[in-house]
Design a protein with these regions (language model features):
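Active-site acidic-Proline motif in GNAT/NAT acetyltransferases
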Residues: 69, 82-88, 114
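Conserved beta-strand-loop-alpha-helix junction that forms the acyl-donor binding cleft
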Residues: 109-119, 135-140, 145-149
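Conserved GNAT-fold acetyl-CoA-binding loop/helix
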Residues: 15-43
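Conserved acetyl-CoA-binding loop-helix of GNAT-fold acetyltransferases
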Residues: 81, 87-100, 124
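A short beta-loop-alpha structural element at the N-terminal edge
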Residues: 1-15
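Conserved acetyl-CoA-binding loop of GNAT-fold acetyltransferases
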Residues: 123-132
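Conserved beta-strand in the GNAT
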Residues: 54, 60-68, 75-80
Length: 158
């Protein structure tokens, strides 16, 4: 079941994101990975600017995904599923929910260029790698230059 997540859910969101993000260790550049991957203060800032949803099973949040409207597009933000629940359709259900909520013509997602599993997930759902990724990352995200250099953008028309 999908439910909107709110401030009081921050600790479980923190847990899901940081457990799932361990997959990045050894994959993304060492200077871009840190533990925790998303500190609590950063999570609070992110929650203030986007809508975040959780997939619940047995009363427990096991996956999270958010969206943020920026200018003329919608961004998929912070898509994570606990490792033991991955490849069971939870990410697909959350992404479908985000697509239904999208009110703009374009839905974009940024991810690490070496996170092949994430890229394949979005491609499976019709997203295409966009060649103008540097311009898009600078226009719609607020990222350090190093992350821009090591990321890709995928998009789909809604």
């Amino acid at each position: 079941m999908i439910k909107a997540l709110i401030t009081k859910d921050a600790s479980i969101i923190y847990e899901v994101i940081n457990k799932a993000a361990r997959a990045y260790r050894g994959t993304i550049p060492d200077d871009c990975y840190h533990d925790p991957y998303m500190p609590k203060q950063e999570l609070r800032r992110e929650m203030a600017i986007m809508n975040l949803f959780g997939w619940y099973e047995g009363g427990k949040v096991i996956g999270v995904m958010g969206f943020q409207s920026v200018k003329d597009v919608t961004l998929v933000r912070h898509a994570y599923v606990l490792p033991e629940y991955q490849r069971k359709g939870i990410g697909t259900k959350l992404l479908s929910h985000i697509e239904q909520m999208t009110k703009t013509r374009h839905l974009l997602v940024g991810t690490w260029s070496d996170a092949f599993w994430a890229i394949q997930f979005y491609q499976k759902h019709g997203f295409k790698l966009l060649p103008e990724k540097d311009e898009l990352l600078k226009k719609y995200w607020n990222l350090p230059q190093r992350q821009i250099e090591t990321s890709v953008v995928l998009g789909i028309e809604t």
